[in-house]
Amino acid sequence: MTPVEFLASNPLAFVLCALVLGLLVGSFLNVVIHRLPIMMQRDWQSQAREFLELPAEPAGAAFNLFLPHSRCPHCDHQIRAWENIPLISWLALRGKCSACKASISKRYPLVELACGLLSGYVAWHFGFSWQAGAMLLLTWGLLAMSMIDVDHQLLPDSLVLPLLWLGLIINSFGLFASLEDALWGAVVGYLALWSVYWLFKLVTGKEGMGYGDFKLLAMLGAWGGWQVLPLTILLSSVVGAVLGTVMLRMQKAESGTPIPFGPYLAIAGWVALLWGDQITASYLQFARL
């Protein structure tokens, strides 16, 4: 029996493998979340210097998603392999650097745990299938985008656009929606928030959201078809309004403070892709339509 046949015939083993893989990917996503915005800023600065015809900055050491090796931000201690095992290392080190004993942010293990649990659930929901593999990629991308948006109010094109094209490609095989529905989903998803953006700007003179949000909703439409868009917009708006109000009441945000909308879109789109039909059917039954 090949490993593929074993996983296909043992759902629990597939779920456990997906969970472990998710933990490992979550560790890498922590690197992406931290380094990708820095890489983008350096690229923008380089382009600005070139546009202004300024001398290029001297080339420094390589800085990308793989180099240099991760180090403690407090003492510059290079993280060893055994200190980089998802969850286990953080627990073994009791959340502190092995060299200087400075605290390690709890967000690192939480991202790893979230990625692992979400990956395990996707494997359980879809079973051993192409849908599960595709949904894992989308889940990891949405998690990275959401955290970057929380930190920087930025949704990188380098993450959003490849996933948009991937959604169209996989739906050319009808994995989640027909190609026609996926194309309309991408177009309508972009135009829906673009229209809201300009209407809000005309009325208030302010920008209510960023262009990255348009692209993110277009990407979700490319994955689930235009049918997932109404539920995605509704859920993200409700959750965003509720959490925004809670944050204002708790004085964690001031009135007028920009609140990233990307995480709400990501969560709502993920929910709509997994349970959209069930949620819609339950609502129609409740409303007796």
UniProtKB/Swiss-Prot annotation:
Q: Which GO terms describe its biological process?
A: methylation; signal peptide processing
Q: Which domain of life is it from?
A: Bacteria
Under InterPro entries, the record lists: Peptidase_A24A_bac, Prepilin_IV_endopep_pep, Prepilin_pept_A24_N, Prepilin_peptidase/N-MTase
Could you tell me what the cofactor note in this record states? Zinc is required for the N-terminal methylation of the mature pilin, but not for signal peptide cleavage.
Listed under GO cellular component are: plasma membrane
What is its cofactor?
A: Zn(2+)
What EC identifiers does the entry list?
Answer: 3.4.23.43, 2.1.1.-
- Please give the chief subcellular localization of this protein: membrane
Q: Which UniProt keywords apply?
A: Cell inner membrane, Cell membrane, Hydrolase, Membrane, Metal-binding, Methyltransferase, Multifunctional enzyme, Protease, S-adenosyl-L-methionine, Transferase, Transmembrane, Transmembrane helix, Zinc
Give GO MF terms, alphabetically: aspartic-type endopeptidase activity; metal ion binding; methyltransferase activity
Question: Cellular location of this protein?
Answer: Cell inner membrane
The catalytic activity, as recorded, is: Typically cleaves a -Gly-|-Phe- bond to release an N-terminal, basic peptide of 5-8 residues from type IV prepilin, and then N-methylates the new N-terminal amino group, the methyl donor being S-adenosyl-L-methionine
Binding positions (Zn(2+)): 72, 75, 97, 100
Q: Which residues cross the membrane?
A: 13-33, 128-148, 159-179, 183-203, 228-248, 256-276
Membrane topology (UniProt): Multi-pass membrane protein
Q: What does this protein do?
A: Plays an essential role in type IV pili and type II pseudopili formation by proteolytically removing the leader sequence from substrate proteins and subsequently monomethylating the alpha-amino group of the newly exposed N-terminal phenylalanine.
Return the similarity comment: Belongs to the peptidase A24 family.
Protein name (database record)? Prepilin leader peptidase/N-methyltransferase
Q: Which organism is it from?
A: Stutzerimonas stutzeri
Q: Name the gene for this chain.
A: pilD
